[in-house]
């Protein structure tokens, strides 16, 4: 009798354990199915809703070529466009309502009133210290000046690319650049940068680390300086820290919601730092009109083609953004 009861209890316990194991197995299988389904759903959603960043098409100065549209239809209804121009333009036009007139012309191209913003800057040099590129699409007009070619090239390199930067403590540390994408960016009201390359014993190569006057000057009284030195060699750096800052930066890639339109000049400026590569002219364009009304009329005519070789981004850019990826 007791044997039967013990057997019954044992069978009952085994059944409970077996049932518990089956339930846990079913739960694990269901969890796997549910999580896998969620993962597939999220992946498909991300792919179907992903931002189209378009194509990096080279623009060699001519704006009469049709490019494949890399933006969504109706994008102008929800996008903003910023047009940056020098003070010279508004002075020459000398019309208090010229912006309203251009806004009406942009309206005929599909850009609603209020979606186009006009931003004035005093000079290329001043603009390079504090550019504020907040719109979905940003067009920067730069009047060609032979005496400012290098400033224009550096500014274009700065705003047409994204940079990830970190502060540099030049009083405590030596620094070296790791490759072509690694640069030191100096910004301020007046930047004079000197460097002293060091050998493996941390002795100066052609300079004395204790004598700043023996350092090699790579920038003098600049507001923006992108410094490139020999890769893989430590350098001691001297900088006018009271009027300037310097950051250790790595170029991450193109900032595709910015384009530069060069006004005048025989060729589009090449902003490539590497002399062995083809000129970098992505989103660099050129118009050759003498009068600013003609320049703006051309931009209105070709605005949609210009935007089609750009890509809308949600990240804004100001002077602090050169130090961080935003």
UniProtKB/Swiss-Prot annotation:
Glycans are attached at residues 69, 238. GO terms for molecular function: metal ion binding. One of its GO terms (cellular component) is host cell endoplasmic reticulum lumen. Residues 1-50 form the signal peptide. Residues 165-167 are annotated as: CNP motif. Ca(2+) 1 binds at residues 95, 206, 214, 216. Residues 253-255 are annotated as: GPR motif. Keywords: Calcium, Capsid protein, Disulfide bond, Glycoprotein, Host endoplasmic reticulum, Host-virus interaction, Metal-binding, Outer capsid protein, Signal, T=13 icosahedral capsid protein, Virion. N-glycosylated. Ca(2+) 2 binds at residues 177, 228-229, 231, 301. Coiled coil: none annotated. It is found in: Virion; Host endoplasmic reticulum lumen. Disulfide bonds join 82-135, 165-249, 191-244, 196-207. Pfam families: VP7 (PF00434). The keyword Methyltransferase does not apply. Homotrimer; disulfide-linked. 2 Ca(2+) ions bound at each subunit interface in the trimer hold the trimer together. Interacts with the intermediate capsid protein VP6. Interacts with the outer capsid protein VP5*. Belongs to the rotavirus VP7 family. Some rotavirus strains are neuraminidase-sensitive and require sialic acid to attach to the cell surface. Some rotavirus strains are integrin-dependent. Some rotavirus strains depend on ganglioside for their entry into the host cell. Hsp70 also seems to be involved in the entry of some strains. In group A rotaviruses, VP7 defines the G serotype. Calcium-binding protein that interacts with rotavirus cell receptors once the initial attachment by VP4 has been achieved. Rotavirus attachment and entry into the host cell probably involves multiple sequential contacts between the outer capsid proteins VP4 and VP7, and the cell receptors. Following entry into the host cell, low intracellular or intravesicular Ca(2+) concentration probably causes the calcium-stabilized VP7 trimers to dissociate from the virion. This step is probably necessary for the membrane-disrupting entry step and the release of VP4, which is locked onto the virion by VP7. This is Outer capsid glycoprotein VP7. It comes from Rotavirus A (strain RVA/Human/Venezuela/M37/1982/G1P2A[6]) (RV-A).
